[in-house]
Amino acid sequence: MESSEVMIMRIIQTAGKRKSAVARATIKEGNGRVRVNYKPVEILEPEIARFTIMEPLVIAGEEILGKVDVDVKVEGGGFMGQAEAARIAIARALVEWTGDMNLKEKFMKYDRTMLVGDSRRTEPHKPNRSTKGPRAKRQKSYR
């Protein structure tokens, strides 16, 4: 291949966070393959996490999904935190890839946290009864 025929491949990388889970999505031209931690999304377990990850793909539609490959690497947190972090990363990547404000509007109308993220975090435990949680009190007895 001559130097004048160099093919430029478009690659977009985005990130999503949920609780302590961090997902990094890479999207490039392809034929619709979606992988999470090197596994096809179709075989992910549990099922509820798979459906959560698939939401932005279903909303975007086959015409967009058929043209791209999505690879997501997720670490930290529990399985639902990871699934929601992956969902955020995929949604952001698809919006950036298409540059379509209608798609962004669809995502925002369906669920705002798909693009914006959810800032809620667990409350730190307080010193009094630290193992019981942040607001645990001794049971009060009137007799």
From Swiss-Prot:
InterPro entries the UniProt entry points to: Ribosomal_Su5_D2-typ_SF (IPR020568), Ribosomal_uS9 (IPR000754), Ribosomal_uS9_archaeal (IPR019958), Ribosomal_uS9_CS (IPR020574), Ribsml_uS5_D2-typ_fold_subgr (IPR014721)
Gene3D superfamilies in the cross-refs: 3.30.230.10
Positions of region (Disordered): 118-143
GO biological process, one term: translation
MF terms (GO), sorted A to Z: RNA binding; structural constituent of ribosome
Database matches in SUPFAM superfamilies: Ribosomal protein S5 domain 2-like (SSF54211)
Family: Belongs to the universal ribosomal protein uS9 family.
Family matches, as HAMAP family: Ribosomal_uS9_A
PANTHER family: RIBOSOMAL PROTEIN S16 (PTHR21569:SF16), RIBOSOMAL PROTEIN S9 (PTHR21569)
Name of the protein this chain belongs to: Small ribosomal subunit protein uS9
